[in-house]
């Protein structure tokens, strides 16, 4: 965190999920039965993959549909007929695409259910409990609320390792300690550390680029492949229901404790932040003089950009040049 006069200026207050609303439910509960009936009628599915997010390009919804198709192609027709992808999102969106058209073109032979209308938190909890796994493979994501809600409900998740999604999968370093991010190591998208919680199946991006806009000049855009996403779906499919449940419940335990993504911790952190601010408040002067050099803007402190710059193997490149020149 930045410091001024040896006092930090920022205090992180993480997202917090209400564990009384988002919780594990029995399949026999009325609301679960009703939501199943609304979604599937009388059809029973063995595997339900749930996507709960917006239809915008960075969410990679089309990639999710194609990955689901690739997953189903690796099953027998009978097995695939008992799998369904549930998309709680807009069918069409200018910032995204025409998802029904994508489904028709890329996944015509398998079941995909769309939910466009808003539903209550209680109904959403039922949805997570109906799901076998929840998926979100955004290429950049501030947090990923649906993943946190799913974890709190005890439902396993599939995520792309980027942005705030990586904060929800219990990553640890080689010594088993939670990963510490700083100005030089701001993301684990390079898979420097591959340890993670059992409730998550992470996918490490294979393409890392820079995106940006006027209000957000730059942000890392990390893209994972639909092929590896299909493998991640298969991971949860092949695991026994009993083991999946154990993995999911470990995720809820983590979220309620060291993970900290629960509403109680969010409120406590907010109280601490307010107390610290009040106790360490530094009144502003009536006026101050600033030069252009005082304005930091979007410059990163100490020329850090949040990622480790790799060392280029010049000897390897020189060897490649020699091989090319030898052909002349």
PLM region spans:
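Conserved donor-binding/catalytic core segment of Leloir-type glycosyltransferases
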Residues: 41-59, 65-68, 85
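A short helix/loop element that forms part of the nucleotide-sugar donor recognition site in Leloir-type
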Residues: 23-42
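Nucleotide-activated donor-binding/catalytic signature segment of Leloir-type glycosyltransferases, i.e.
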Residues: 91, 96-122, 175
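Short hydrophobic beta-strand element within catalytic cores of glycosyltransferases
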Residues: 156-159, 169-170, 176-186
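C-terminal amphipathic helix plus adjacent low-complexity
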Residues: 200-328
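Aromatic "clamp/platform" in nucleotide-sugar-dependent glycosyltransferases that forms part
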Residues: 139
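Conserved active-site histidine-acidic residue motif and adjacent donor-binding/catalytic loop
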Residues: 29-35, 109-131, 163
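Carbohydrate-associated surface elements
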Residues: 16
């Amino acid at each position: 965190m930045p410091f001024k006069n040896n006092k930090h200026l920022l205090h992180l207050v993480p997202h917090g999920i209400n564990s009384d609303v988002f919780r594990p439910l029995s399949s026999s509960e009325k609301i679960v039965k009703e939501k199943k009936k609304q979604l599937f009628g009388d059809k029973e599915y063995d595997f339900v993959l749930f996507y709960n997010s917006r239809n915008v390009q960075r969410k990679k919804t089309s990639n999710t549909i194609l990955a689901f198709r690739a997953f189903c192609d690796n099953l027998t027709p009978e097995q695939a007929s008992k799998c369904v992808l549930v998309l709680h999102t807009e069918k069409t969106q200018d910032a995204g695409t025409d998802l029904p058209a994508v489904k028709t073109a890329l996944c015509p032979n398998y079941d995909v259910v769309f939910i466009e209308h808003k539903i209550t938190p209680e109904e959403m909890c039922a949805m997570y409990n109906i799901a076998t796994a929840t998926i979100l493979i955004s290429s950049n994501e501030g947090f990923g609320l649906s993943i946190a809600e799913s974890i709190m409900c005890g439902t396993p998740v599939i995520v792309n390792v980027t942005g705030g999604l990586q904060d929800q999968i219990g990553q640890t370093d080689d010594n088993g300690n939670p990963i510490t991010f700083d100005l030089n190591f701001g993301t684990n998208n390079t898979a420097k550390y591959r340890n993670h919680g059992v409730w998550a199946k992470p996918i490490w991006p294979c393409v890392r680029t820079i995106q940006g806009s006027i209000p957000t000049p730059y942000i890392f855009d990390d893209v994972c492949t639909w092929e590896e996403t299909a493998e991640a779906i298969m991971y949860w499919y092949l695991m026994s229901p009993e083991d999946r449940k154990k993995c999911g419940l470990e995720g809820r335990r983590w979220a309620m404790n060291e993970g900290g993504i629960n509403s109680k911790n969010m409120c406590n952190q907010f109280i601490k932040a307010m107390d610290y601010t009040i106790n360490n408040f530094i009144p502003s002067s009536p006026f101050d003089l600033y030069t252009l050099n005082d304005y930091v803007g979007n410059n990163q402190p100490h020329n850090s950009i949040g990622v480790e710059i790799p060392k280029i193997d010049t000897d390897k490149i020189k060897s490649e040049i020699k091989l090319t020149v030898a052909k002349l």
